[in-house]
């Protein structure tokens, strides 16, 4: 049995790009063009079982994590997910834990879904772009109707059943101008974890090189700084914000949890509905299709020279300006998909979000460094040497009251 050399997270898309919404910024809807009408509309049971078994066999982690994505995965129906759980229970080794995560637009969530997700211990991520006017600007259904009320109803139902769903908010040219309104809306509805995903749509033919909906880099940095200041004053230990956790991980000597900020990537591939393996969710194209799990095992694909080369390219193509940047350890050049502008001296490969990232990481660094120093001094005690890193059984520095291993250790939230 071949194990992967590192932990990994697969974005599995059993129904491909199929979705009941038609969000105008969605980069995945167009992936339907990769597959002809002869392909299955959903992952067949034999491919599903093969994937689950291979994932379990390949995982080196103490807890095996599955991430179900789309499109919109709830279109598969509850019976399909019951089959998923049944197959996982059939194949998992005795005593080994399995955790499932699902990323959904929440518009189809009802009482039955909530009971199932709660009973089976699913983690849930919901796409919600803030107050109604921001969310509905881009996130409409195929009939052009608004979706905010339906998504919020799904979020509320999940809370009623004891499921604290994570929020994934796409930050774009509209809502980036209103950081306080966006953040306070999420606090008002009871969100405990928020991921802010900047929208970057490359448009080489446009004067700005990006679409009008793209969040301006400096504005995105300011958006994060404004929210960070309110969070630092009022919400440490109450609300988790993924970008803030990532900044803190560096100060605490931890590797970034989100692939965007790691030195290398390649550990978050995609499995499409027919078993095709792609290097990354943002690189689902013919050049990055490495094989199919019906012919090559998941572990072999993860460890393949092409996949490892894809991951190393993140560090190997880092511009010189990034290599000497004061916040490199927090950023590591960002995602490869966004590296399409040039540095001040004309070197290509700079991240479009560089100015915003630098603005935010420079702004928050004194606070998170002080937090780390305070934690080390408290952990050291009289006559002891302050630990340089957080131990698995130490209290989580986020203030949740949980042990680090039960809270922020190794969290790689649903980022797309």
Tell me the role of every PLM-derived stretch.
Residues 50-69, 310, 348-382:
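Short Fe-S-cluster ligation motifs
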Residues 51-53, 57-67, 76-201, 407:
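Radical SAM/AdoMet-radical enzyme domain recognition
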Residues 137-149, 156-265, 270, 274, ...:
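Radical SAM enzyme [4Fe-4S]-AdoMet core and its adjacent flexible, acidic
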Residues 18-29, 279-282, 319-337, 397-409:
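Local cysteine-cluster metal-coordination motifs and their immediate loop/turn environment
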Residues 284-328:
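Membrane-interface junctions of multi-pass transporters
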Residues 373-416:
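Acidic/negatively charged segments and metal-coordination signatures
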Residues 1-13, 61, 377, 382-387:
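N-terminal [4Fe-4S]-dependent radical SAM core
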Residues 5-46, 408-413:
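Canonical Radical SAM [4Fe-4S] cluster-binding loop centered on the CxxxCxxC motif
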């Amino acid at each position: 049995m071949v194990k992967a050399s590192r932990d990994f997270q697969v974005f599995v898309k059993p129904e491909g790009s199929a979705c009941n919404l038609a969000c105008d910024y969605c980069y995945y809807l167009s992936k339907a063009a990769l597959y002809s009408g002869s392909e299955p509309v959903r992952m067949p049971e034999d491919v599903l079982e093969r994937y689950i078994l291979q994932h379990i066999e390949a995982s080196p982690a103490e807890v095996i994590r599955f991430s179900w994505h789309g499109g919109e995965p709830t279109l598969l129906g509850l019976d399909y997910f019951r089959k998923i759980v049944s197959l996982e229970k059939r194949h998992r080794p005795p005593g080994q834990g399995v955790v499932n995560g699902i990323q959904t637009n929440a518009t189809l969530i009802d009482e039955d879904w909530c009971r199932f997700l709660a009973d089976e211990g699913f983690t849930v991520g919901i796409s919600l772009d803030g107050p109604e006017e921001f969310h509905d600007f881009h996130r409409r259904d195929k009939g052009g109707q608004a979706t905010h009320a339906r998504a919020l109803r799904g979020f509320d139902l999940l809370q009623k059943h004891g499921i604290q769903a994570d929020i994934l908010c796409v930050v774009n040219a509209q809502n980036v101008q209103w950081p306080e309104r966006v953040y306070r809306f999420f606090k008002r509805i009871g969100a405990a974890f928020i991921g802010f995903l900047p929208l970057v749509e490359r448009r080489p033919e446009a004067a700005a090189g990006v679409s009008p909906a793209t969040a301006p880099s400096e504005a995105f940095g300011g958006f994060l700084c404004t929210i960070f200041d309110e969070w630092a004053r009022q919400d440490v230990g109450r609300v988790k914000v993924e970008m803030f956790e990532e900044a803190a991980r560096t100060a605490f000597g931890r590797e970034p949890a989100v692939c965007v900020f790691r030195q290398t990537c390649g550990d978050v591939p995609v499995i499409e509905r027919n078993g095709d393996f792609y290097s990354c969710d943002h690189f689902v194209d013919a050049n990055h299709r490495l094989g199919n799990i019906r012919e090559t095992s998941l572990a072999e694909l993860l460890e393949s020279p092409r996949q490892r080369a894809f991951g190393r390219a993140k560090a190997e193509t880092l511009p010189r300006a990034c290599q000497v940047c004061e916040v490199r350890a927090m950023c590591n050049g960002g995602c490869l998909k966004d590296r399409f502008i040039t540095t001040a001296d004309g070197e290509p490969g700079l991240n479009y979000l560089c100015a915003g990232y630098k603005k935010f990481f420079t702004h928050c660094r004194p606070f998170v460094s002080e937090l780390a120093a305070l934690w080390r001094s408290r952990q050291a005690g009289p006559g002891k040497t302050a630990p340089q890193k957080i131990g698995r059984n130490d209290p989580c520095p986020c203030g949740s009251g949980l042990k680090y291993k039960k809270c922020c250790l190794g969290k790689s939230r649903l980022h797309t």
